[in-house]
Amino acid sequence: MPGCLVLVVGPSGAGKDTLLRLARAALAGDPRYVFPRRLVTRPPSADEDNDEIDEAAFAEGCAAGRFTLSWRAHGLGYALPEAVGRRVAEGHVVVCNVSRRVVAGARESGRRVSVVEITAPPEILARRIAARGRAQDGDLAARLAREGGVTADLTILNTGAADEAAARLVAHLRAC
């Protein structure tokens, strides 16, 4: 069975990490599903499932092609380890939280790609971002002003119970 790279995108505060955590728990018994940790040039937080990488290692990894995908956002570097591409090639469904900016390149990579957009109304996004209380989240207005600009295979409006939104995500992953 062919693998699939599932790219989860959406604005800050949409609840991507919450839904990914719930989906990972729901699919924990099935080795076909992989939820790798991103590399980010900041210390990990309780709200995200990331590993820290310093700026020099990030720049070196980008230059050497050691990442499946990499991008910069909010003044930080983000990357998916090269093992992500191998897992897709082995037939796994690999589910990653990424920037919309990398979707076009991922679709051109020759891998099977599915895009899931998780979103919420601006007032909910603002409330969730403010509740994090992280100085590195930067300018709240700038984060909320970003446009989608990506065609998704599934869009989840995450305004109600997280379990309901996660069930939609899990159903999509099982269909991949």
From Swiss-Prot:
It comes from the Bacteria. One of its GO terms (molecular function) is ribose 1,5-bisphosphate phosphokinase activity. Gene3D superfamilies: P-loop containing nucleotide triphosphate hydrolases. This is Ribose 1,5-bisphosphate phosphokinase PhnN. Belongs to the ribose 1,5-bisphosphokinase family. Pathway: Metabolic intermediate biosynthesis; 5-phospho-alpha-D-ribose 1-diphosphate biosynthesis; 5-phospho-alpha-D-ribose 1-diphosphate from D-ribose 5-phosphate (route II): step 3/3. Its EC number is 2.7.4.23. It comes from Methylobacterium radiotolerans (strain ATCC 27329 / DSM 1819 / JCM 2831 / NBRC 15690 / NCIMB 10815 / 0-1). Catalyzes the phosphorylation of ribose 1,5-bisphosphate to 5-phospho-D-ribosyl alpha-1-diphosphate (PRPP). InterPro entries: P-loop_NTPase (IPR027417), PhnN (IPR012699). The gene is phnN. It catalyses: alpha-D-ribose 1,5-bisphosphate + ATP = 5-phospho-alpha-D-ribose 1-diphosphate + ADP. ATP binds at residues 10-17. GO terms for biological process: 5-phosphoribose 1-diphosphate biosynthetic process; organic phosphonate metabolic process. Keywords: ATP-binding, Nucleotide-binding, Transferase.
